[in-house]
Amino acid sequence: MSVAKVDDNRKVTTHRLIEMKQRGEKISMLTAYDYSMAKLIDQAGMDVILVGDSASNVMAGNVTTLPITLDQMIYHGKSVMKAVNRALVVVDLPFGTYQGNSKEALASAIRVMKETHADCIKLEGGAEVRESIERILCAGIPIMGHLGLTPQSINKFGTYTVRAREEAEAKKLIEDAHLLEEIGCFALVLEKIPAELAARVASELTIPVIGIGAGGGVDGQVLVMHDMLGINQGFSPRFLRRYANLGEEITRAVQAYIEDVKSQDFPNEKEQY
């Protein structure tokens, strides 16, 4: 497998993502939640790093994204920002911090921006959270939208199945996508929707559309780091491509360490002072 060379070390900005869409350059996006992994991902040349509320699942062991708090998201965001020089860093607003009212939404977004120094925030939903989005945007905070399968609404959906297969839901998604662009979102994530629908949305919008389980006709792709590196071994949806099996490698390394300690092979003479 060839390794992409990073020729441009300039800081990635929201405007630069739009330029990438205009010239047909695909956008790479991956999650990170801590300093060490964020540093490696940034040095590898990732365009966008998402401090996702998926930390609730892969870092804290929760079944859904719902339990993670704003304080916890800020902790992860601060850790990532200390490591990143090039990538655009997006921090998710967690469940319950923007759905209630626009004043609460703005306060949440301001806390994230002030305390993490992130570049922008991401939130889920369309017309139903319009007021919150507009109020945050009026404060000069860039927003990435998120439509399709929105994990914070899992109790409403009841399942993580593909969304917008039916005509009515697809129509609403298209309307919401145009609305998010119209009111000022700089980019949009589409999760787990039919590839044809996602490609249509990407072609109709001027802002970048980044997909996860949304086919190849969008402007970029995002995956959860633990999934694509094979750390989260129990998760294997159709859209996921594994680029490593670190779960197996870590297990082997730990077992080798245990054996060396038990057998007194570690430390040897060269590993002592």
Curated annotation (Swiss-Prot):
UniProt entry keywords in alphabetical sequence: Cytoplasm, Magnesium, Metal-binding, Pantothenate biosynthesis, Transferase
Localization annotation: Cytoplasm
Cofactor binding description: Binds 1 Mg(2+) ion per subunit.
Record: residues binding Mg(2+): 53, 92, 124
Biological process, per Gene Ontology: pantothenate biosynthetic process
Subunit field text: Homodecamer; pentamer of dimers.
PANTHER family for this protein: 3-METHYL-2-OXOBUTANOATE HYDROXYMETHYLTRANSFERASE
Protein's name in the database: 3-methyl-2-oxobutanoate hydroxymethyltransferase
Protein source organism: Parabacteroides distasonis (strain ATCC 8503 / DSM 20701 / CIP 104284 / JCM 5825 / NCTC 11152)
